[in-house]
């Protein structure tokens, strides 16, 4: 057996230019990383031979089609397309000049979208030029880019992270910013641009496509669906990349914590999971690991639950488990829980208003300006959370909701309620809470076989769409429960995913976030099992992500259930 220290490989020693690391990339890789770099990915059969683009019927919008039509006069109504085999189609295309940008937070697989797009250009449009815009959309506006070639891309194949060209959260939305993007497109003579991002980024990609078309620029814009949160999806886009990997990383850690809880027999682990809006990650991790309690934000909202309702539900389960001799357990909480509780939102709105105009006095006279319901809720909160609400403001003077550590708040609220029940003789157990936040750990892991392959197909498909003269579409790969060879490839009209929101008196286009559907198969399966999980320890420890052998090609429960394949 090789010694433990021999698990790294210096790619500079390989001698092949394809394996030379890009500037700024660590040159030392683990054995697993090295094996992933050199792993060849399969493509859907339709992308292996000659093919053509077939257009579907005219599209509409997810909501308010009349308003979307006004906002996108050049793109609205365009059809979605499918790539289909065609032996008579040419197998090669004229060379192109293409740019790519990573936008928003990291998600495992982003590098493979770029690799797939690059390989399409190498194989089908020989002699093409490929630019990577550095640091997100700001790189487009400032014309900061790097020319991507085989040597530069190779060390990033099948690797996590966005560090090949890095990402950013800037938006191209003002007239000046659109003008900067136009100047960059003209300067580099771009035939196309691929925007890899979430719902906001793809909304901006559509606005950019509309702008370029209105100015008669030849630059076409295609989006790719990225977000670990899993809230960018529809019938044609079954999942966003990164969700599969992130959920498996979190589920491994949750499984480890479960075994720890069972081993010590004395801790309740409160685990907050990333997902600012939708609770998809929390639901998927619950299906993978079977925790005792899982809070789904969309259900809390639908049932108009209060913070006390949520706390009482947890305490009820903890008391029942204590009667069975279990003084331990695992509780999953979505990051965006606070946003789903109407009374908390009302309290925050009132605090923002009061603190914008008042100095908070130590005697608490300012509290008289709160409504009765908000005052009652404020007094219910632990002191540390009260201080956080009062003191930590963003640059606009508002409460920083994202910084509220919900898991710690709930531990304190559960402790308080359990103490009351103990005094009343209704609880005889022992309670010790441990808090965790699993978030950043899942954003840049080595992508699973599914995410690596899915992203590669998305990138290759984006190249096909650009070469076919399409713009304002999002690269779409479907039939994902089937073997890779049978996956379908196409493009979905971005305007078909859009609705409008009223902001500052104007309609703004937005791609609607896909929330957890309480009538959907994933939630229904969870709901049918949660009572059993609450009192019986049905813990599953999935272990680390596998790249070969059992479990290596498994798909998320959410995807399989939504596709009707489980």
Curated annotation (Swiss-Prot):
Gene3D superfamilies: 3.40.50.450, Phosphofructokinase domain, Phosphofructokinase, domain 3. Allosterically activated by fructose 2,6-bisphosphate. Keywords: Allosteric enzyme, Cytoplasm, Glycolysis, Kinase, Magnesium, Metal-binding, Phosphoprotein, Transferase. It is an enzyme of class 2 (transferase). Its cofactor is Mg(2+). One of its GO terms (cellular component) is cytosol. Pathway: Carbohydrate degradation; glycolysis; D-glyceraldehyde 3-phosphate and glycerone phosphate from D-glucose: step 3/4. The modification Phosphoserine is found at residue 16. GO terms for molecular function: 6-phosphofructokinase activity; ATP binding; diphosphate-fructose-6-phosphate 1-phosphotransferase activity; metal ion binding. Disruption phenotype: Retarded growth and reduced pyrophosphate--fructose 6-phosphate 1-phosphotransferase (PFP) activity. Substrate binds at residues 227-229, 266-267, 274-276, 335, 440-443. Its main location: cytoplasm. Diphosphate binds at residue 105. It is found in: Cytoplasm. It catalyses: beta-D-fructose 6-phosphate + diphosphate = beta-D-fructose 1,6-bisphosphate + phosphate + H(+). It comes from the Eukaryota. Its EC number is 2.7.1.90. GO terms for biological process: fructose 6-phosphate metabolic process; photosynthesis. The record marks 200 as: Important for catalytic activity and substrate specificity. NCBIfam families: PFKA_PPi, PRK07085.1. Tetramer of two alpha (regulatory) and two beta (catalytic) chains. Belongs to the phosphofructokinase type A (PFKA) family. PPi-dependent PFK group II subfamily. Clade 'Long' sub-subfamily. Catalytic subunit of pyrophosphate--fructose 6-phosphate 1-phosphotransferase. Catalyzes the phosphorylation of D-fructose 6-phosphate, the first committing step of glycolysis. Uses inorganic phosphate (PPi) as phosphoryl donor instead of ATP like common ATP-dependent phosphofructokinases (ATP-PFKs), which renders the reaction reversible, and can thus function both in glycolysis and gluconeogenesis. This is Pyrophosphate--fructose 6-phosphate 1-phosphotransferase subunit beta 1. The lineage of its organism: Eukaryota, Viridiplantae, Streptophyta, Embryophyta, Tracheophyta.
């Amino acid at each position: 057996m090789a010694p433990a220290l021999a698990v790294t490989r210096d790619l500079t020693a390989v001698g092949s230019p394809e394996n030379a690391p890009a500037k700024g990339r660590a040159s030392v890789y683990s054995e697993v990383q090295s094996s992933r770099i050199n792993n060849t990915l399969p493509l859907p059969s339709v992308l292996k031979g000659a093919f053509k683009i077939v257009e579907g019927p005219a599209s509409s919008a997810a909501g308010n089609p009349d308003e979307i039509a006004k906002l996108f006069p050049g793109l609205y109504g365009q059809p979605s397309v499918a790539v289909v085999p065609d032996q008579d189609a040419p197998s090669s295309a004229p060379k192109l000049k293409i740019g790519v940008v990573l936008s928003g937070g990291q998600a495992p697989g982003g590098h493979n979208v770029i690799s797939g797009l690059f390989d399409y250009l190498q194989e089908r449009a020989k002699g093409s030029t490929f630019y990577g815009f550095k640091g997100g959309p700001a790189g487009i506006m400032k014309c900061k880019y790097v020319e991507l070639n085989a040597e530069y891309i190779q060390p990033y194949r099948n690797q996590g992270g966005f560090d090949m060209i890095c990402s950013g959260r800037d938006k191209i939305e003002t007239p000046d910013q659109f003008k900067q993007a136009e100047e960059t497109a003209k300067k580099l003579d771009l035939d196309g641009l691929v925007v890899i991002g979430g719902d906001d980024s793809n909304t901006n990609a559509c606005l950019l496509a509309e702008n370029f078309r209105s100015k008669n620029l030849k630059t076409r814009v295609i989006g790719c669906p990225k977000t670990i949160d899993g809230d960018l999806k529809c019938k044609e886009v079954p999942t966003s990349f990164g969700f599969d990997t992130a959920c498996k990383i979190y589920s491994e850690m949750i499984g480890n914590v479960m075994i720890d809880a069972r081993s010590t027999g004395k801790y309740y682990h409160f685990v907050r999971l990333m997902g600012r809006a939708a609770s998809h990650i929390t639901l998927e991790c619950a299906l993978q690991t079977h925790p005792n309690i899982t809070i789904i934000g969309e259900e809390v909202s639908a049932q108009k639950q209060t913070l006390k309702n949520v706390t009482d539900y947890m305490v009820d389960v903890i008391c029942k488990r204590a009667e069975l001799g279990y003084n331990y357990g695992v509780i999953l909480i979505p990051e965006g829980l606070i946003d789903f509780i109407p009374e908390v939102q009302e309290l925050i709105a009132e605090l923002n208003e009061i603190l914008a105009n008042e100095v908070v006095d130590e005697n608490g006279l300012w509290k008289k300006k709160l409504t009765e319901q908000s005052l009652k809720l404020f007094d219910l909160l632990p002191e540390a959370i009260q201080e956080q609400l009062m003191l930590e403001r963003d640059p606009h003077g508002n409460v920083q909701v994202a910084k509220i550590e919900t898991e710690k708040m709930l531990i304190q609220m559960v402790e308080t309620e359990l103490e009351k029940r103990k005094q009343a003789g209704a609880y005889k157990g022992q309670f010790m809470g441990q808090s965790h936040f699993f978030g950043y750990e899942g954003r840049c892991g080595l992508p699973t076989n599914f995410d690596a392959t899915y992203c590669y197909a998305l990138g290759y498909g984006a190249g096909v769409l650009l070469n076919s003269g399409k713009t304002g579409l999002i690269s779409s790969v479907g039939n994902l429960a089937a073997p890779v060879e049978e996956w379908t490839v196409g493009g979905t009209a971005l305007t078909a995913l859009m609705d409008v929101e009223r902001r500052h008196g104007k309609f703004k286009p937005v791609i609607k976030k896909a929330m957890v559907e309480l009538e959907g198969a994933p939630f229904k399966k969870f709901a049918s099992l949660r009572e059993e999980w609450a009192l019986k320890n049905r813990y599953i420890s999935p272990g680390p992500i596998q790249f070969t052998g059992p479990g290596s090609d498994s798909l998320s429960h959410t995807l399989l259930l939504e596709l009707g394949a489980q």
